[in-house]
Curated annotation (Swiss-Prot):
This is G kinase-anchoring protein 1. One of its GO terms (molecular function) is identical protein binding. The keyword Phosphoprotein applies. GO terms for cellular component: Golgi apparatus. Residues 20-111, 145-171 are annotated as: Disordered. Residues 39-48 have a biased composition (Polar residues). Interacts with PRKG1 and IRS1. Residues 102-111 have a biased composition (Basic and acidic residues). It is found in: Golgi apparatus. It comes from the Eukaryota. The modification Phosphoserine is found at S23, S25, S27, S104. PANTHER family: G KINASE ANCHORING PROTEIN 1 (PTHR14899), G KINASE-ANCHORING PROTEIN 1 (PTHR14899:SF0). One of its GO terms (biological process) is positive regulation of insulin receptor signaling pathway.
Length: 363
């Protein structure tokens, strides 16, 4: 099962992949053996196919062995070895004759160190992924065993309880238990607890913890590599860290100043708002007073007008009374004048008659 998984998982190049496999079957196809050409050709074809098959098998075995060794190293917390291909390339390039090698050695050292770190980190991550997959497969394989053990323990507990109940039926006194039985029960309970704890630990949270541990291990190794760097790089990183801290402090102070400025502006705006609120209240009170005054003035005007109307009405009534009285007096005077006119007419007529009579008498 583990070999099938390892063949399906994408793996990194191991140390043994660079080695050339020497096949011992080449002696069969060598010339000068005293055989015919036709038979030699058929045998050479067969030998080449056999050699290819053997090489493939050997390569597979070597890959499996290398992967198993890497997994063992991971299990015993060994640091994975660097790739031999990168080391060989580095040695080959360093051995080449280069006139400017002394000047550019420091720059090339940093580049090679970075490449080496990348390769080791990639290999380590791939090996950790393999270990995680293998642990998951082992858990899936042993899951049924854990479940069977748990079921057996629960069944044994139930049977023990039933037996105890049967023995206790019809008896008032409790039965005495020997030391061996008590210890055996404790041992069974401890086993069941251990099995349950193992089952719980093999749940989904277990793999999350594994991933967290892997992440922590990677971070620790990176920190160790950073600490093991030479003093110049350490000083440079410390200087950069100090610069970052200073920049962060400057940014924090700038933000604090901006916050204080904004707070002052907010306080000023609050004061302005309070002043405008006070003015608004004053204007509102004045408007209320003006409304009252206008209402009172209108009421006064109305009252004065009503008084004037009453006075004019009373004067009108008085004048009408006077006019009626004067009209009555006029009528009386007119009647008197008529009476006097009648009397005058009578008097004048009497006088005319007297004159006529006197004239007649005179004649």
């Amino acid at each position: 099962m583990a070999s099938a998984v390892l063949s399906s998982v994408p793996t990194t190049a191991s140390r043994f992949a660079l080695l050339q496999v020497d096949s011992g079957s080449g002696s069969d196809s060598e010339p000068g053996k005293g055989k015919g050409r036709n038979t030699g050709k058929s045998q050479t074809n067969k030998s080449t196919t056999n050699e290819k098959k053997r090489e493939k098998r050997r390569k597979k075995k070597e890959q499996q062995q290398s992967e198993a060794n890497e997994l063992r190293n991971l299990a015993f917390k060994k640091i994975p070895q660097k790739s031999s291909h990168a080391i060989c390339n580095a040695q080959h390039e360093l051995s080449l004759p280069n006139p400017v090698q002394k000047d550019s050695r420091e720059e090339n050292w940093q580049e090679w160190r970075q490449r080496d770190e990348q390769l080791t980190s990639e290999m380590f991550e791939a090996d950790l992924e393999k270990a995680l997959l293998l642990s998951k497969l082992e858990y899936e394989e042993h899951k049924k065993e854990y479940e069977n053990a748990e079921n057996a323990s629960t069944q044994s507990k139930v049977m023990n309880k039933k037996d105890k109940r049967k023995t206790h039926q019809g008896k008032d006194k409790p039965l005495t238990i020997s030391l061996k039985e008590f210890q055996s029960e404790d041992h069974i309970s401890k086993k069941t607890e251990e099995l349950s704890s193992q089952i719980l630990s093999h749940d989904g949270g277990f793999f999350n913890r594994l991933e967290d541990d892997v992440h922590k291990i990677l971070t620790r190794e990176k920190r160790r590599e950073q600490l093991t760097e030479y003093n110049g790089t350490d000083n440079y990183t410390v200087h950069e860290h100090n610069q970052e801290v200073v920049l962060k402090d400057g940014r924090i102070e700038r933000l604090k100043l901006e916050l204080e400025r904004k707070d002052a502006e907010i306080q000023k705006l609050k004061n302005v708002i309070a002043q405008w609120e006070a003015k608004y209240k004053e204007v509102k009170a004045r408007n209320a007073q003006l409304l009252k005054m206008l209402q009172e003035g209108e009421m006064k005007d109305k009252a004065e007008i009503l008084l004037q109307v009453d006075e004019s009405q009373s004067i009108k009534n008085e004048l009408t009374i006077q006019v009626t009285s004067l009209h009555a007096a006029l009528e009386q005077e007119r009647s008197k004048v008529k009476v006097l006119q009648a009397e005058l007419a009578k008097y004048q007529g009497g006088r005319k008659g007297k004159r006529n009579s006197e004239s007649d008498q005179c004649r």
